[in-house]
Amino acid sequence: MLASEAASALTSICSTCRGHMAEHFMGLLQILEQVDKFNLKPEAANGLIKGVVMIISIMTNSEQLAEAVEKVCVIQVTPLTNIMNGVSAGGDQPKIVKHSVTDPVLYLDRLSAVFRHIQPGGGAVPRDTPHPCRHTIESLWPVLSRALELYQRDVRVTERTCRTIRFAVRCIGVQSSALLQPLVTQMVALYASQAHSCYLYLGSILVDEYAGEAGCIPGLLSMLQAFITPTYRILSVPGGLVAHPDTVDDFFRLNARFLQRAPVPYLQTEFLKSVLECALLSATLEHRDANASVMKFFYDLLHAGRARESAADHSVRSKLVKCLHAEYGEKLVDSLVKAAVTVLPSYTYHDIGDVIQECLLHDRVRLK
């Protein structure tokens, strides 16, 4: 207990006095190397890493910064690799004791803390300047890829691995492009066999980061298309929507992200109508987060036809959305009104109202 309190105090000191603590970096690194011997709570250990990373962030020499980040990551990668080496070729795993040195999540969360809090130059690295963390993240990818493969049946480890990848991608943005193809290929294959919704969530992060690059959009749309069949398979069985609200939430978040970042290519896909049909069925789901994602999808879909009127693609977007509204508008409003009256709780009414208002703005006469 005392060790955890001391670690928390040290974290606060690192955060408040970064400039003064920079000269003690090597000493802090030695503490990180011994952290598993201190019997710290996971939160305290992660906080300690956060404090050290804050100090690294103010280093002005990019080479020194990159070297410091790599050293912190190696301290976590070494035990993580040792744990994975204990998994047999047949996939048999030694028992994982949560929050112990046998738990890969312990080290994945620490890596997440590194990439979540590292901010070279205050977080503003120019696009044409190599990110100091790029080499470390590219070197780390084989380890994370292996973790996804080895622990594919363990949703807890898979979620934490995806979380680490998410923060790594957010850290260096489009400079992680070398990882995009192998990452998407592995995500698609593993989602087809295991259908963990965290892959859908990670997919939405990739869309957010890469959809601004025109050359990446076809591959991202192919990723979404590959996700559709496994998603429909688990949602279409009796009780599937109720049993898998996280999948509903993450699937429609992913689709909404395309509407926000690459609306025209998304609106032109052949599979969009099937997504709309799935959304209509999902709109009656009484689950706060899942229902909110479905409504956000409907809202973003309709709003895409009116948003950014000065943009060059506005006329194309408007035409595509009008065609969809003409086919689905009445059915959508009817479904939402019935669901609000008979099934859904009052906390959904605001989102439902926003969707219906967008429908009215498109064609008030038809919907009277």
Task: Locate each region found by the language model.
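Karyopherin-beta/Importin-beta family HEAT-repeat alpha-solenoid scaffold
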Residues: 1-368
